[in-house]
Regions:
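N-terminal beta-loop-helix "entrance" segment that forms/cooperates
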Residues: 36-56
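A glycine-rich helix N-cap at a beta->alpha junction
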Residues: 50-71
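A glycine-centered beta-loop-beta connector
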Residues: 72, 93, 101-119, 272, ...
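Non-catalytic interface/targeting segments
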Residues: 109-183, 251-279, 288
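Short, ordered loop/turn segments at secondary-structure junctions
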Residues: 10, 40-42, 63, 106, ...
């Protein structure tokens, strides 16, 4: 059973306050159900003295019985860090069956929103050979999406310059194809690996689970070339590597629509009815993210008896 609020008249005097307290307690003892004493105004001096004299807490103050967002059953989906990869964000959405994620800082302040549409738009419209560098993608994310290991380099560094290049040609052709700081995806051909180092590539992604020779590791380290070893073939590497981009590069940062618990459901409905957005972030009184709600949650709002 939902709680029943027991309340007196507005601008309550001592009789109104005490009656609500006593009747709520009586009904609770008779039925065992939750009855909550409430008040529709502030406690005056006389009533405050009586309550303190008998050690009774003042009833809950209710400004209005019009449903607010605090009455809505929202989704308590934790926010994500802006450095999370699109790969992990996508999996997080699927695991929680939600199409929108809040991107927050360590204090749960909202930094942006990420939707399935944003991810799809990035893959169709925005992703190109320079996307990883433009997003300043971390090597930690790259190793994660490639299910690989960092053979040479610093896991906390970022790939900030260069394009993604597939070394599908002979070394003599690659010399004109690989640019400085590029990320080169290749196989186990020693000559191609050596060529990438000589052309000052920024990173080599060596696929098919190929073992990286000691000589290549030494030369790469001396020339500042990172090496990621992965069990994936070239096609799979090309397919998944863009998923390493951090969500901050794709998320929406401007004109975010947020709501607070004390806003009335009717006011919220009027606002969201004009938007083509499925989920909205709910913020607490301190402006910290607490969860997501949808128009469906508003329609399923339960009402308490009074």
């Amino acid at each position: 059973m939902n709680p029943v609020f027991v309340i007196g008249h507005r601008n309550p005097d001592t009789d109104s306050i005490c009656s609500a307290i006593c009747y709520a307690e009586l009904k609770h003892r008779m039925t065992g159900e939750p009855y909550i004493p409430c008040r529709a105004g502030h406690v005056n001096t006389e009533t405050k003295f009586v309550l303190e004299r008998f050690g009774v807490q003042a009833p809950r103050y209710i400004k209005s019985f019009e449903p607010c967002l605090s009455d809505v059953q929202y989704r308590r989906i934790p926010g994500i860090d802006e450095e999370m990869s699109l790969h992990r964000a996508w999996n997080y959405m699927n695991e929680n069956d939600i199409q929108t994620l809040a991107v927050v800082d360590e204090d749960r302040h909202l930094k942006g929103l990420l939707t399935l549409g944003d991810i799809a738009r990035f893959y169709i419209e925005d992703q190109d050979a320079n996307a990883l560098a433009e997003a300043k993608t971390s090597y930690r994310n790259l190793v994660d999406v490639l299910d690989g290991t960092l053979e040479v380099g610093d896991i906390d560094q970022r790939f900030e310059q260069g394009s993604v290049v597939v070394a599908a040609a002979n070394p003599d052709v690659l010399e004109d194809y690989i640019g400085k700081n590029d990320m080169v995806i290749l196989g186990n051909r020693y000559e191609s690996q050596l060529c990438a180092i000589e052309m000052s590539a920024g990173c080599m992604v060596i696929g098919l689970g190929s073992k990286v020779s000691r000589t290549i590791r030494k030369l790469a380290s001396e020339n500042g070339v990172s090496i990621i070893a992965t069990p994936y073939d070239t096609y799979t590497c090309v397919k998944v590597i863009g998923q390493a981009v951090p969500v901050r590069h794709v998320m929406r940062k401007k004109r975010l629509i947020t709501f607070e618990p004390e806003e009335t459901v009717e006011d919220v409905k009027r606002t969201v009815s004009k938007k083509r957005i499925r989920y909205y972030p709910l913020m607490d009184e301190q402006g910290r993210y607490v969860g997501m709600f949808s128009q469906r949650n508003l329609c399923l709002l339960y009402t308490s008896d009074a």
